[in-house]
Amino acid sequence: MGSRFLLKIILLVILLAGVAAPSVARPSQSSPTSEYSIGRIIIKTTERKLLFVKGEKDIIEYKIAVGRQGREWTGSTSISRKVLNPAWAPPPKIRKDNPRLPALVKAGPNNPLGVAVLVLGDGTYGIHGTNRPETIGTFASYGCFRMYNKDILDLFSRVAIGTSVTVVP
């Protein structure tokens, strides 16, 4: 057996492991502090987790993908738009790195934004689904936050435009 064949088998096992163990939104045992007010989203990038503070002692935790090295960011913002079945116009930086990308990716199974996007602030970043679920739990994006499609739909139903989002290391 060649080393390339063995590498392909290992990659297949890793990919299947990610598919076989999808994220489950689950209540967290931790209690929110005053910083984590009800209705707020907290993103913990090093842990690759998004927390939605549902109630005083009720936090829903989602597994996410975050910005790769050099693309991470921290700070506070809010949800400025909510879009189901979004089209995506790749920004110039992403098109430069991926010249095969079209100027516009229509909604559907090939769209990197998945089934929904929560646009943050001025629109540079968002919390969105994905067409690459195997990347959830990794440092993979250009700064956006990827979720399993079922998880973004769950979060989408819980938040409104204006919801506060805090991104911490």
Language-model-detected regions and their locations in the chain:
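N-terminal secretory signal peptides
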Residues: 27-71
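Exported/periplasmic cell-wall-interacting domains
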Residues: 27-28, 36, 56, 70-71, ...
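N-terminal secretory signal peptides that target proteins for export/translocation
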Residues: 1-4
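Sec/Tat signal peptide C-region and signal peptidase I cleavage site
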Residues: 21-25
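Bacterial N-terminal signal peptides
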Residues: 8-18
